[in-house]
Amino acid sequence: MTLLEIAVNEFNRISKLMGYVINPPYTGKLLKYDFGRGIPPEQPVFWQQYHDMLRMSNRLFADGHVFYGLKSDNESHDLLNFNQTLNTPGLENQLMTGKIAIGHNNLDIFYYDVFIERWVTCDRIGVDRIIESCNTLAELIETQIAMLKSSNSDIC
């Protein structure tokens, strides 16, 4: 079992303990997508890891912690729609140049930085204030698992 499989399974285990519905794997086709914001269209490192997560669970959610899926029933938690919104005139944030938003919790945003190839948690208001910087998506998911366990020790 890969580290990503372990992380996704553990996140979903906690989610299920909290009473949330676990999302099935994404079975659709992945297309090239232009995220804009100075992000080159080809993102093999991003898509390899994110695609692997989606093929296990098309969206992770537990207690306000979410990693976006593709074409989910909750369009506000759709990876492509959320990133398209960041390109809307008036909503642009120069600090999100080169960053693919992949999720959030109540206080922070999760993104993939295409220039340094890192998976990052930053403050929702101060996007330039990095809280966690990880080599892999699995490591980033593990940071959220630790937070969930810490704040819900009675059920985890």
Model-inferred region functions:
Residues 1-109:
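A surface-exposed partner-binding patch
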Residues 106-107, 126-128:
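Glycine-centered tight beta-turn/hairpin loop motif at sheet-sheet or coil-to-beta transitions
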Residues 116-124:
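Short aromatic-glycine-(Arg/Gly/Cys) micro-motifs in beta-strand/loop hairpins
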Residues 129-149:
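Compact, glycine/acidic-enriched structural inserts
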Residues 152-156:
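Short acidic DE-rich linear segments
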